[in-house]
Curated annotation (Swiss-Prot):
It catalyses: N(6)-carboxybiotinyl-L-lysyl-[protein] + acetyl-CoA = N(6)-biotinyl-L-lysyl-[protein] + malonyl-CoA. The keyword Transmembrane helix does not apply. The lineage of its organism: Bacteria, Bacillati, Bacillota, Bacilli, Bacillales. Pathway: Lipid metabolism; malonyl-CoA biosynthesis; malonyl-CoA from acetyl-CoA: step 1/1. The gene is accA. It comes from Listeria monocytogenes serovar 1/2a (strain ATCC BAA-679 / EGD-e). Acetyl-CoA carboxylase is a heterohexamer composed of biotin carboxyl carrier protein (AccB), biotin carboxylase (AccC) and two subunits each of ACCase subunit alpha (AccA) and ACCase subunit beta (AccD). GO terms for biological process: fatty acid biosynthetic process; malonyl-CoA biosynthetic process. It holds the Pfam family ACCA. This is Acetyl-coenzyme A carboxylase carboxyl transferase subunit alpha.
Length: 318
């Protein structure tokens, strides 16, 4: 229960009450079956009401849930014969980004994604999913390899952002991100990017120059975190909830703005509730997108990607 979120409190309280009644019903002579059934119907309505009316801040909390599935979780369910590749051939390996070659329904692909840790030790090893330059350069090495051998590229995005430490800056963090944007724009193979959790700033963009970009229903994508925006705008990070509502960071917002190409439904309560069911939803999206993009020629893929990003941010003054 420690990982449950504030907006779920009414649901948890009712679930607890139902559990207590069921336990009592098993040991008592009093039949509480009807009362339990009524409460379960009430619970279903309450869950439907709360989960269908989540605010941007609620979704941000779900996107950051410590049990939210990671890139490796999805790789294990979506792909066959995955072989992880390591290192950028310049400085070293970065565990905050994982990637390798695999097959998707018989199609050879390259899979790359941010990787958060599952516990404190793992998070320290993976730097909480915040890549150093060598992580982005490893990703680019794998992309160039995919481009050379004609393998589609599938990227999973889930990071607070690129690591802002001194060592990362000394090794060329901004150049590494910019290089990925530049090189990805000219890849001759299909690129599908999926935001599975938090899409934070340039760290997310470095895997986000795709022919098609999708977001999980409760994922977020923004130039800065709500806490950071609140600290800058109002000098008060505690106003993060207000900032989240103003920033338009949700999957619905990004789709409405024309930045993403679709929203992948999440299981009720968030992807962490049922990994297998959530992987199946992602599977449907990748299948449809991959088959559509593989019908494009190399020139069409490059042109489509260019036109997609050229349109972002365009507006007319009336």
């Amino acid at each position: 229960m420690a990982n449950e979120m504030e907006f779920e409190k009414p649901i948890l309280e009712l679930k607890s009450k139902i559990a207590d009644l069921k336990e009592y019903n098993e040991t008592s002579d009093v039949d509480l079956t009807n009362e339990i059934e009524k409460l379960e119907k009430r619970l279903a309505k309450l869950e439907s009401s709360i989960y269908s009316n989540m605010t941007a801040w609620d979704k941000f909390q779900v996107a950051r849930h410590p049990e939210r599935p990671t890139t490796l979780d999805y790789i294990s369910l979506l792909f066959e014969d995955f072989m992880e590749l390591h290192g950028d051939r310049t400085f070293g390996d970065d565990a905050a980004i994982v990637g390798g070659i695999a097959t998707f329904k018989g199609i050879p692909v390259t899979v790359i994604g941010h990787q958060r840790g599952k516990d404190t030790k793992d998070n320290l090893h993976r730097n909480f999913g915040m890549p150093h330059p060598e992580g982005f350069r490893k990703a680019l090495r794998l992309m160039k390899q995919a481009d050379k051998f004609g393998r589609p590229i599938i990227c999973f995005i889930d990071t607070k952002g690129a690591y802002p430490g001194r060592a990362a800056e000394e090794r060329g963090q901004s150049e590494a991100i910019a290089r990925n944007l530049y090189e990805m724009s000219d890849m001759k193979v299909p690129i599908i990017s999926i935001v599975i959790g938090e899409g934070g700033s340039g760290g997310a963009l470095a895997l986000g120059v795709g022919n098609q970009i999708f977001m999980l229903e409760n994922a977020v994508f923004s130039v800065i975190s709500p806490e950071g925006a609140a600290a800058i705008l109002w000098k008060d990070a505690s106003l993060a909830k207000k900032a989240a509502e103003s920033m338009r960071i949700t999957a619905g917002d990004l789709f409405e703005l024309g930045i993403t190409d679709g929203i992948i439904p999440e299981v009720k309560g968030g992807a962490h509730r049922d990994l297998t069911a959530q992987a199946e939803e992602i599977n449907k999206t990748i299948t449809k997108s991959l088959h559509a993009l593989m019908a494009f020629s190399e020139e069409q893929l490059i042109k489509q990607r260019y036109e997609k990003f050229k349109k972002i941010g365009v507006y007319e003054t009336i």
